[in-house]
Curated annotation (Swiss-Prot):
Keywords: ATP-binding, Coiled coil, Helicase, Hydrolase, Nucleotide-binding, Nucleus, Ribosome biogenesis, RNA-binding. ATP binds at residues 346-353. Residues 681-729 form a coiled coil. Residues 333-507 form the Helicase ATP-binding domain. A motif (Q motif) lies at residues 302-330. Belongs to the DEAD box helicase family. DDX27/DRS1 subfamily. This is ATP-dependent RNA helicase drs1. Gene3D superfamilies: P-loop containing nucleotide triphosphate hydrolases. GO terms for biological process: ribosomal large subunit assembly; rRNA processing.
């Protein structure tokens, strides 16, 4: 028995305790007997010197073990105290407790609000997270030119030049000024011939327009609101027409040709839905569930807890202050949890993002966790929308272990590849960057995708995205759940069938043409011949009417940039948002507008879809958009989530069709429509100010161009240096591939522009064609002849015709002489 005793001594001294189930007895013995009992045991088996060493080591271990055990014992004691505090009702309760199957009481409700009260975000809009700002700073490679800095620098130069003028010139200028004042006093009043001419041009028309517009304002106050000035003639009755025809001096009102065409188009569109198309829809869509009025009233009182969602999801919803689901969320969440395909549509600002994010998170909570795999792909048409959706999804998943990744253009490819190596659960991307990683990143596989979401699906189904969408759909698995959402969702079966939907459920909460009921729509009419005063109207509205939290939409990036410079010169704080800016600049513009550093956001249709910024009070359309659908998305940036807002459109005669469609849909819905009257003299004054700034605007543009060229030259230098230093590494990288050639890209871009603006816009642009040598020589000869360097040289035909003319002329002269 001696050998076992020798082995037990080192076991007690050198064995290190680990966390396991067998250590509970050891811990309890240590806590009950204390350090003295342990010292006695060690004294029997070790020397005095060893005793000191072991005592020091065991004391440090015992402290940690005691803390762990105390926490466990504390929890157990709490449970015992709670059990002891309950009233004893005899042995029957003990028998019932032993037979408990673990099910929750049906009346039990989670106190989600109190649990997440510390992290509640009031009015969360998907922006302002630190991740977005850090990502923009880290991944923004391009340093843009600061327009405000150029403007301030030029203004400082002008002030310095004025100060450098000698005092003599100042005295002379004062004398000249006094002389001019004397001359002006002789006339009695100053005469501005330019203003006089403008008033003379509009003299008769101005009075008529004013009466029409004042009549409209009276009609607006009485409750009958019109689309814009001039619509009274469209709504006149037959009796008025007969009375007008009886009087020779009054012309019978005639309907505008564009209105006639739009009415005919509308009737044709309504008649297009024939029996064949209806049969297609019945065969393609799943049958819709009929809800009674009582069930609809009950649904409006529902909360998120009644969807049987998991506690982490409910805590995430409470953290962003989502309490009651919106109509689209009430309809979508139960169907999406069943794994069915969905085609959803609701007005702007109704919570469509949360409608598909919440069921996705709920399903991912029950995923297998042994091997990380990417299961969800959410595709967005614009970068800003993808960044916003990423922020919303990560905020809702705060209390879960679900991982996310955003694949957006403008951010670092290397960092995105590193994140993809970890196989995140949800991928939020734009189509172009998604395809780039799909083809060129070895760590990214799409074979495991189970859910595909297309946000703003009607835009994704247009010709501009058709090729990219087809490439994605043919690569990812066909056995998936597909969900499509948009405010203006298409019903065309031919378009939807391309997505590969399997008997989708159609969830149309509102009509496709509806706007928010809290939105007031205004229209400012530009009379024929006053289209060049459009900027004057905009400056008047932004300077005197709508002074803060305004988004101004433009059709062209060039026009938005010029107006941005004009706003800076006039002292209006503005930021721009369009496709010519780097991703860092775009995110910075949105953040500055959101935080109130700037009052105006000048944007193209890039910001028309999905952008959710809290507190936007007004949307101004510098020009009416190309279609009514785009108009709905633009004005949907305000009056979101039950808040009120206002939209103002500056409309001329070419915009008549879109304005009429908007007014017609709003009246059918019962929304507020008004006509805003702007004094032409005020608009002319602001237009003249804008005209005076043209020279300064061009100078700022020229200086900006020079700075961009310098920045580009610096970038080329650094690129060349990197090529020299790291040539072997750069040349060893595999070349990135794309599914389409450059020619196919150009054709796809043209197809998208043709669908948006019409075929005429594409045909009107002159295509750049490479000239042959023969054509170049012909152009050079014509240029030289025009300059007068080389005279015109007769050709063979010209010489022969000239000879024939001389012969015929001689014969005629001989005949005349013979007659004489």
């Amino acid at each position: 028995m001696a050998p076992p005793k020798k082995r037990t001594a080192p076991k007690d001294d050198d064995f290190v305790l680990t966390l396991s189930d067998d250590e509970n007895d050891v811990f309890s013995g240590i806590n009950e007997d204390g350090d003295d009992h342990l010292d006695e045991e060690t004294a029997k088996s070790t020397t005095k010197k060893r005793k000191r060493d072991t005592a020091e080591t065991t004391q440090s271990k015992n402290k940690k073990q005691k803390q762990q055990k105390q926490s466990k014992n504390g929890k157990q004691q709490k449970k015992v105290e709670e059990a002891a505090s309950e009233p004893e009702e005899g042995s029957e309760e003990e028998e019932d407790a032993g037979e408990d199957d673990g099910a929750l009481n049906s009346d039990f409700e989670f106190d989600v609000g109190a649990a997440a009260q510390k992290d509640v975000v009031e009015g969360f809009d998907g922006w302002g997270l630190d991740e977005t700002k850090d990502g923009a700073k880290k991944n923004g490679d391009k340093q843009g030119v600061d327009i405000d800095e150029i403007i301030s620098r030029r203004q400082a130069k002008k002030e310095a030049q004025l100060k450098k003028k000698p005092k003599k010139q100042e005295v002379e200028s004062e004398d000249e000024g006094s002389g001019n004042e004397d001359d002006a006093s002789d006339g009695g009043m100053s005469v501005d011939f330019q203003d006089d001419e403008l008033m003379a041009e509009d003299g008769f028309g101005m009075g008529a327009d004013g009466e029409d517009e004042s009549g409209q304002s009276d009609a607006q106050e009485s409750g009958s609101e019109d689309e814009h000035a001039g619509s009274d003639s469209e709504d006149s009755d037959d009796d008025d027409d007969d009375a007008a025809s009886d009087n020779d001096s009054v012309a019978t009102p005639v309907q505008h040709p564009d209105d006639v065409a739009s009415d005919n188009d509308g009737s044709d569109i309504e008649s297009e839905v024939d029996a064949e198309e209806e049969a297609k829809r019945k065969a393609f869509f799943a049958p819709e569930e009929q809800t009674s009025e009582q069930s609809a009233a009950e649904l409006s009182k529902k909360s998120f807890q009644e969807f049987n969602l998991s506690r982490p999801i409910l805590r995430g919803l409470a953290a962003v202050n989502f309490t009651n689901p919106t109509p689209i969320q009430r309809k979508t969440i139960p169907v999406a949890l069943l794994g069915k395909d969905i085609v959803g549509s609701a007005v702007t600002g109704s919570g469509k993002t949360a409608a598909f994010v919440v069921p996705i998170l709920e399903r991912l909570l029950f995923r297998p966790r042994k091997v990380p795999t990417s299961r969800v792909a959410i595709l967005m048409p614009t970068r800003e929308l993808a960044v916003q959706c990423y922020n919303v999804a990560t905020k809702l998943a705060t209390y879960t272990d679900i991982t996310f990744c955003q694949l957006v253009g403008g951010f670092s490819l290397r960092e995105q590849e590193n994140i993809l190596k970890k196989r995140p659960d949800v991928i939020i991307a734009t189509p172009g960057r998604f395809i780039d990683h799909m083809r060129n990143s070895a760590s990214f596989t799409v074979d495991t995708l189970e859910i595909l979401v297309l946000d703003e699906a009607d835009r994704m189904l247009e010709d501009g995205f058709a090729d990219e969408l087809n490439e994605i759909l043919t690569t990812i698995p066909k056995s998936r759940q597909t969900m499509l959402f948009s405010a203006t969702m298409t019903d065309s079966v031919d378009k939807l069938i391309r997505v590969g939907l399997n008997r989708p459920v159609r969830l149309m909460v509102d009509s496709k043409k509806n706007t928010s009921m809290n939105l007031i729509q205004e229209f400012v009419r530009l009379r024929p011949g006053r289209e060049d005063k459009r900027l004057g109207y905009l400056l008047h509205l932004c300077k005197e009417v709508y002074t803060g939290r305004v988004i101004v939409f433009f059709r062209q990036k060039k026009e938005a940039h010029r107006v941005r410079i004009a706003f800076g010169l006039l002292g209006l704080k503005a930021a721009e948002l369009h496709g010519s800016m780097s991703q860092e600049q775009r995110i910075r513009s949105v953040e500055n507008f959101r935080e109130g550093k700037v009052s105006f956001l000048l944007a193209t249709d890039l910001a028309a879809r999905g952008l959710d910024i809290k507190g936007v009070e007004t949307v101004i359309n510098y020009e009416a958009p190309q279609s009514h659908e785009i108009y709905l998305h633009r004005v949907g940036r305000t009056a979101r989530a039950g808040r009120s807002g206002r939209a103002c459109t500056i409309a001329a005669e070419p915009d008549r069709k879109v304005v009429k469609a908007a007014v017609k849909a709003s009246k059918a819905q019962g929304a507020k429509v008004a006509s805003r009257v702007v004094d032409p003299a005020v608009a002319d004054r602001w237009a003249q100010k804008a005209k005076d700034l043209e020279e300064e605007i061009n100078a700022v543009l020229e200086e900006e161009k020079i700075e961009k060229q310098l920045a580009q030259a610096e970038m080329q230098v650094t690129r060349s240096e990197n090529m020299i230093k790291h040539e072997a590494e750069i040349m060893s990288r595999p070349k990135r591939t794309w599914f389409a050639s450059e020619r196919e890209k150009i054709l796809s871009k043209k197809a998208g522009a043709a669908e948006l603006n019409g075929l005429d816009s594409v045909k009107s642009k002159k295509e750049k064609v490479r000239l042959s040598n023969k054509d170049k020589k012909r152009l050079d000869d014509s240029r030289q002849r025009n300059e007068g360097n080389i005279g015109w040289k007769k050709g063979k035909v010209d010489r022969e015709s000239q000879k024939q003319g001389k012969i015929q002329k001689g014969k005629k002269e001989n005949k005349k002489k013979g007659k004489k």
